[in-house]
C-alpha cells in the first residue's frame, strides 16, 4: 500500500522488490532487483494498493562450472522499498535443495586468469514474520539448444519462388533461399553498398535522406522481397530534416547531414520539390529510465512507430540497452541503467510501443560495448 502523506502536492512513487540470495556457494550481490512498478498519481492523504510479482527463475544464479542457472539451496530474503538504498526485509523464501532451472553452454569462456573481487562480509538480516518454502517439483528445467552446422538444402523446384509464395505457405523460406545465387545472398548481406560521397555511416539510405541505410533491392523485382529502410536512434528518428528533389523525384545533394554538418543545395531547379522530415526529440535512454515508468516508455515507442510509418521507415536501430559498466563510457547517455533487469524492462516497454504500430525495432549495441571513443580497440572479457 502506497500512501501520499503530504498535504499539498500529488505525486507518484516507485515500489521496488529486491532479492538477497543465499550466499552459501556461488558469488552473488547483496541484493538484486526482481520487480518494480510505478504508482498512479496519488493526491495527498490518498493511497493505492499495488501488487508485484516475479518469476521464480529470477532466484537462480549462473554456474560456469556446470553451465547452468541454479537456485541454490538456502534462504532468500525478499525486500521491498523505493530504492536499492531503502529496503526492508519482508519475507524469507526457503529452498531445500539445489534446483537447475536452465541448461546452457559456455560460449564466451575467459582466456586469462582473473582474480575475483570479494566484498567484505555483509550481514543479511532475515525476515521472521513470513516464511515460504519453495516447491521444487513445480519448477521445470529449460534446456537451451544451440545451432549446429546446418545440412545443405537441395531444391528441385523449377518454379521461381517469391516471398508471396512463402507467405502463402506454398513453399518454405529455406526452399526460396536455396534458389538464390551466391551474388544475391552476398548483396542481401551488404545492403545498398553505396560507394559515392553521399554514403556516410549512420546516413547512407538511397530512399530516405538521413536514414541509416537500406537493405538490398536485388530481389524486389524477381522475388517480391522489398528492401527495408533503417533509421538510427535512440533519441527519436534520425532523419535529414529538409531535402530537395527535382520534378522526377531524384534527391539533390545538400542539406543537414550527420552530426549537424550542413551542405548548401546547389543548382536547384525552379520546379524542385522541398520535403520536410521533422521528428520528435525523445528524451535519451538514461533520462527515460529514471522515470521507472514502463507505460511512459510504451507511449514514447508509439510516437516513434507513428513517425516511422509517416516517413516510410521499416526498422529503428534502437533502443540502446548496454549496461552502464564504466562511468567513462562515451555513450552511457544512450543506455538505460547499470541494472540489467531495469534496463531490460525499459527496453521491452519501448519496443512494445513501436511494434504496436506494425513497425520493427533493433535493440543495440554489441554486448559489453563499454568504450567510445575509440570503439574499435576495446577488449571485452566476459564471464
Where are these regions (language model features)?
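Short beta-strand elements
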Residues: 86-105
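Glycoside hydrolase catalytic-domain context in secreted enzymes
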Residues: 1-61, 68-86, 104-383
Amino acid at each position: 500500500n502506497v500512501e501520499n502523506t503530504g498535504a499539498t502536492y500529488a505525486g507518484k512513487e516507485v515500489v521496488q522488490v529486491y532479492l538477497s540470495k543465499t550466499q552459501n556457494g556461488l558469488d552473488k550481490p547483496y541484493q538484486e532487483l526482481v520487480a518494480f512498478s510505478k504508482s498512479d498519481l496519488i493526491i495527498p492523504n490518498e493511497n493505492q494498493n499495488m501488487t508485484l510479482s516475479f518469476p521464480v527463475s529470477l532466484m537462480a544464479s549462473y554456474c560456469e562450472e556446470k553451465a547452468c542457472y541454479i537456485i541454490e539451496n538456502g534462504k532468500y530474503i525478499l525486500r521491498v522499498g523505493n530504492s536499492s538504498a531503502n529496503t526492508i526485509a519482508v519475507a524469507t523464501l526457503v529452498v531445500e535443495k539445489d534446483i537447475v532451472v536452465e541448461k546452457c553452454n559456455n560460449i564466451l569462456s575467459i582466456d586469462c586468469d582473473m582474480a575475483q573481487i570479494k566484498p567484505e562480509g555483509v550481514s543479511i538480516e532475515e525476515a521472521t514474520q513470513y516464511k515460504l518454502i519453495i516447491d521444487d517439483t513445480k519448477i521445470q528445467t529449460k534446456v537451451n539448444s544451440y545451432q549446429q552446422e546446418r545440412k545443405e538444402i537441395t531444391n528441385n523446384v523449377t518454379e521461381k519462388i517469391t516471398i508471396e509464395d512463402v507467405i502463402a505457405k506454398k513453399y518454405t523460406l529455406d526452399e526460396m533461399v536455396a534458389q538464390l545465387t551466391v551474388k544475391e545472398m552476398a548483396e542481401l548481406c551488404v545492403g545498398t553498398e553505396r560507394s559515392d560521397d553521399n554514403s556516410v555511416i549512420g546516413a547512407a539510405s538511397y530512399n530516405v535522406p538521413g536514414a541509416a541505410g537500406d537493405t538490398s533491392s536485388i530481389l524486389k523485382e524477381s522475388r517480391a522481397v522489398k528492401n527495408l529502410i533503417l533509421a538510427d536512434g535512440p533519441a527519436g528518428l534520425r532523419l535529414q530534416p529538409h531535402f530537395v528533389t527535382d520534378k522526377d523525384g531524384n534527391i539533390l545533394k545538400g542539406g543537414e547531414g550527420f552530426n549537424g554538418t550542413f551542405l548548401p543545395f546547389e543548382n536547384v531547379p525552379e520546379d524542385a520539390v522541398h520535403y520536410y522530415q521533422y521528428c520528435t526529440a525523445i528524451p535519451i535512454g538514461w533520462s527515460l529510465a529514471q522515470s521507472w515508468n514502463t507505460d511512459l516508455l510504451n507511449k514514447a515507442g508509439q510516437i516513434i512507430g507513428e513517425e516511422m510509418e509517416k516517413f516510410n521507415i521499416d526498422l529503428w536501430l534502437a533502443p540502446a540497452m548496454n549496461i552502464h559498466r564504466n562511468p567513462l563510457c562515451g555513450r552511457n547517455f544512450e543506455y538505460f541503467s547499470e541494472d540489467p533487469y531495469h534496463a531490460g524492462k525499459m527496453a521491452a516497454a519501448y519496443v512494445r510501443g513501436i511494434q504496436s504500430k506494425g513497425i520493427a525495432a533493433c535493440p543495440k549495441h554489441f554486448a559489453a560495448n563499454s568504450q567510445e571513443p575509440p570503439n574499435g580497440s576495446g577488449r571485452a572479457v566476459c564471464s
